[in-house]
UniProtKB/Swiss-Prot annotation:
Compositionally biased residues, Polar residues: 94-115
Residue span of region Disordered: 65-115
UniProt keyword annotations, A-Z: Developmental protein, DNA-binding, Nucleus, Transcription, Transcription regulation
Classification via PANTHER family: TATA-BOX BINDING PROTEIN
One GO location term (cellular component): nucleus
Annotated source species: Danio rerio
Biased composition (Basic and acidic residues): 75-84
Disulfide pattern: none
Taxonomic path: Eukaryota, Metazoa, Chordata, Craniata, Vertebrata
GO biological process annotation, one example: hemopoiesis
MF terms (GO), sorted A to Z: DNA binding; RNA polymerase II general transcription initiation factor activity
Protein name (Swiss-Prot/TrEMBL): TATA box-binding protein-like 2
Amino acid sequence: MNMDEEASLESYFDQTIAGSSDYIFEGDLGLQGSTSQLQDSSFLSSLASQEKDLTEDLDLSFLPDELSTQDEPSQVEKESKNEDSGIYTDCPQKESTQADIDTSNSAQNTSQFNLPMTPMTPMTPMTPVAESSGIIPQLQNIVSTVNLACPLDLKSIALQARNAEYNPKRFAAVIMRIREPRTTALIFSSGKMVCTGAKSEEQSRLAARKYARVVQKLGFPAKFLDFKIQNMVGSCDVCFPIRLEGLVLTHQQFSSYEPELFPGLIYRMVKPRIVLLIFVSGKVVLTGAKERSEIYEAFENIYPILKGFRKQ
């Protein structure tokens, strides 16, 4: 490098440093040297060599091959070579040197938190899951209620509607039936209606809407308000005979068994609040649920108890 090139280089550094108010090396790097010492190219070369040593000490084996930079020259080495050959990029010297400092700090942090990689393996649950019965109770009947929100003339409905009967001496409601879904409705003069016989929640709602539509066609301003499932009945078979006498003696506070009056044992579960009818043959009927999940939960609770009283 001749004298003219060195002079132009020194002039370039002077202009760059003088034009930036936050270009302070001493505060950023903890150096005690003067500004003239920073302008010396040999001092910048020694700084680059120190950063190179820090980078070479890093263990980058955890990175993929395409991201590993151990076999490639670092950015500091490239800039050092460019400075020695008198070649400079269009970026200001401040941004280039600040990027070098950030790279060095990032490399040091990576070295501190570098942990060996281990293969991922599925973890076994700490608490074993209780054995499932494998039996799913089937819904047999759903009872729902709805408010038609208008007074009704039951005699007029019974005379005009098909499949409807009304005997006020026996029961103060119109009994109406439809085939699809196969259900029965009890329609009261207050506008309240009870729908029973559906096998699912969707069928119960559909049937209730059909009954409300029939009442509308008969000239009443019927609405469809406050539909609610009031009771669900499910049943299943455990496929083994049960000693009901032993069961009632062990669970006296929850169960009652009087074979002279009713052949099944009545078991009143507290949580969920379900009533179970248990028969010697292994048939079980569950009633009193508002949601089908309560039926499933109640059966899973009673199944281990029934296995304990299985007839040999």
